[in-house]
């Protein structure tokens, strides 16, 4: 990976890490991508699991062709290009092509509904939209009137073109490439756009797609660059050119993008994309075959594999006795650890877990057997890293210490005893929310602190312990941001619903509803009929929601929810 040119001075101060940097961006983010492609030209780069492999030189050619497509169709530096589809090599190439051309990428979760995709494309002012197979069948181009065209990610064919320039460029792309490079295309010819200053906008990552709730997080190049510096420092000794890695998390999510794709690509690794739904069986098979050297995951992936492949073997009377026998216990634990290690491919240095809360039972079990894992903490607004510790230094229950270039503090000040809001600032922090000054002012204060909305404490050694969320946002099993108010807003508009709360129970969402009993009485409805009506409401609601926002059940409350003087429901009373 390209080496950092920034210089840093770290010091512990009030349980935070301060930083000072030299803003010389000569070795910029896009320069890192360019250097990686040139340096690892003949290395395997990207593989769609069970599919075709692209070498770094193949990636360079595809990027160059997309640059020609952008230029010939009139895309300017700073224009927005949206991408919405499952993880695959061509998604990664299109993303890199966007940034290295000088355009702004707008990654969109493929799980968003069609209306959410339309809203994001329109709100972001995107000029082009790249879509995957499934997304292409769901969206309506007429609801995105300002885009020049839609490009199919699997083969870069045009789904729709609204300009002659775009149509001509795509139909003659190979010819145009041949005219620009009549003899050959070599690595010496790769010359990408370099960002002009650290605060230049690199991408906009939306936390939600619903009109009225959309927040497009503006990620500058300094944040992308700083996350690379962090990852290089944390993993440089364990991640090497040619190593196999797996991309499971959505690349449209900052966690998956930064640490399952960009870091590995900059290091010269061979990245395998799981193009199918990452079920426990598919993931376990991929781990066994690919044998990744670093595993980045959300808790659910780890928990399901352990619960399915490991814990059943331990739930026997004989094993329980052995684990309690002092002179046998350590040998048994070592054997169990080896089995768990094999379940994840058997070659990795550590598993880094983040994106959602980790199950305490599983975390305690992994510590008990001495398994190499750690838990990090981040946010989309920090692109994403806030804190991390190597697994050797991981403190149970914590999510590490402030990452390089970042400060963390607790407000109000009594960080070691009383939980307060976690605040962070540094190079990783966003510029703000796109076209949303009010939300930006609420999230970023005048001193540059990002207010996370999370409650926590910091111990004497700087380890951060999250105690809860002051915001109402929930986290899906794969780290998706879930805003209950949006679901409640839709639920409250359905028949017989007066008010509702959406709560999370393990990885399931449940709607708590206070029905309109007066209306039910007027219709002579029994309680059984009200329950049937609520089940129909659940089905109706789920048809409009992405998979991770669907309700598993609706529970009826026979009394109104308790409220504050401002008539807000006291959410903390309901679980």
Task: Report each predicted region and the residues it spans.
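N-lobe entry segment of adenylate-forming
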Residues: 1-73, 77, 96, 101, ...
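Structural core segment of the AMP-binding/adenylate-forming
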Residues: 32, 73, 100-179, 507
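Conserved pre-ATP/AMP-binding loop-to-beta segment of ANL
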Residues: 41-42, 170-206, 213, 238-244
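Conserved AMP-binding/adenylate-forming
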Residues: 52, 68-115, 248
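Conserved AMP-binding A3 loop
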Residues: 55-56, 193, 202-228
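Conserved AMP-binding/adenylation subdomain of ANL enzymes
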Residues: 225-244, 252-338, 347, 372
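Conserved ATP-binding/catalytic segment of the ANL
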Residues: 409, 416-417, 421-476
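Conserved C-terminal "lid"/linker of ANL adenylate-forming enzymes
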Residues: 474, 499, 504-510, 538-575
């Amino acid at each position: 990976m390209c080496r950092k040119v920034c210089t840093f001075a770290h010091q512990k101060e009030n349980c935070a890490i301060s930083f000072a940097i030299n803003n010389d961006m000569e070795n910029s983010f896009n320069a890192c991508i360019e250097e990686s492609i040139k340096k690892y030209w003949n290395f395997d780069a990207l593989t769609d699991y069970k599919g075709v492999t692209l070498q770094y030189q193949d990636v360079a050619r595809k990027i160059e062709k997309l640059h020609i497509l952008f230029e010939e169709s009139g895309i300017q530096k700073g224009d927005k290009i949206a991408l919405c589809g499952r993880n695959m090599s061509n998604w990664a190439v299109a993303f890199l092509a966007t940034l290295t051309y000088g355009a702004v990428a707008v990654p969109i979760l493929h799980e968003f509904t069609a209306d959410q995709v339309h809203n994001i494309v329109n709100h972001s002012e995107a000029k082009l939209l790249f879509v995957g197979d499934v997304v292409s069948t769901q969206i309506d181009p007429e609801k995105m009137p300002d885009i020049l065209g839609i490009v199919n990610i699997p083969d870069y064919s045009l789904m729709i073109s609204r300009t002659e320039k775009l149509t001509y460029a795509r139909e003659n792309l190979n010819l145009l490439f041949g005219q620009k490079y009549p003899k050959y295309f070599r690595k010496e010819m790769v010359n990408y756009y370099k960002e002009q200053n650290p605060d230049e906008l690199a991408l906009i990552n939306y936390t939600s797609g619903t009109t009225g709730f959309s927040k497009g997080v503006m990620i500058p190049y300094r944040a992308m660059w700083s996350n690379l510096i962090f990852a290089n420092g944390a993993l440089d000794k364990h991640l090497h050119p040619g190593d196999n890695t797996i991309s499971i998390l959505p690349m449209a999510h900052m966690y998956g993008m930064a640490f399952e794709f960009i870091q590995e690509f900059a290091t010269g690794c061979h990245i395998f994309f799981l193009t199918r739904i990452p079920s426990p069986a598919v993931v376990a098979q991929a781990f066994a075959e690919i044998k990744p050297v670093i595993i980045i995951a959300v808790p659910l992936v780890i928990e399901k594999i352990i619960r399915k492949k490991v814990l059943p073997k331990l739930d026997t009377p004989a094993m329980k006795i052995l684990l309690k026998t002092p002179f046998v216990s350590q040998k048994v634990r070592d054997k169990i650890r080896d089995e768990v290690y094999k379940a994840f491919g058997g070659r990795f240095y550590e598993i880094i877990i983040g994106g959602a809360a980790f199950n305490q039972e599983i975390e305690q079990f992994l510590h008990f057997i001495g398994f190499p894992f750690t838990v990090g903490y981040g946010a989309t607004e920090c692109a994403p890293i806030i804190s991390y510790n190597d697994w050797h230094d991981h403190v149970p229950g914590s999510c590490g210490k402030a990452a390089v270039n970042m400060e963390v503090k607790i407000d109000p000040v009594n960080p070691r005893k009383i939980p307060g809001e976690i605040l962070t600032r540094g190079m990783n922090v966003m510029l703000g929310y796109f076209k949303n000054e009010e939300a930006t002012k609420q999230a970023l204060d005048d001193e540059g602190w990002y207010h996370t909305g999370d409650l926590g404490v910091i111990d004497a050694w700087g380890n951060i312990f999250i105690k809860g969320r002051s915001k109402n946002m929930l986290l899906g099993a794969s780290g998706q941001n879930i805003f209950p108010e949006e679901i409640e807003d839709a639920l409250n508009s359905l028949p017989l619903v007066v008010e509702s709360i959406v709560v999370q129970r393990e990885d399931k969402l449940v709607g708590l509803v206070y029905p309109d009993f007066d209306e039910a009485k007027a219709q002579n409805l029994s309680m059984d009929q009200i329950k049937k009506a609520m089940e129909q409401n659940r089905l109706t609601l789920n048809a409009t929601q992405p998979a991770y926002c669907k309700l598993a059940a609706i529970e009826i409350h026979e009394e109104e929810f308790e409220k504050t003087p401002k008539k807000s429901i006291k959410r903390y009373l309901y679980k």
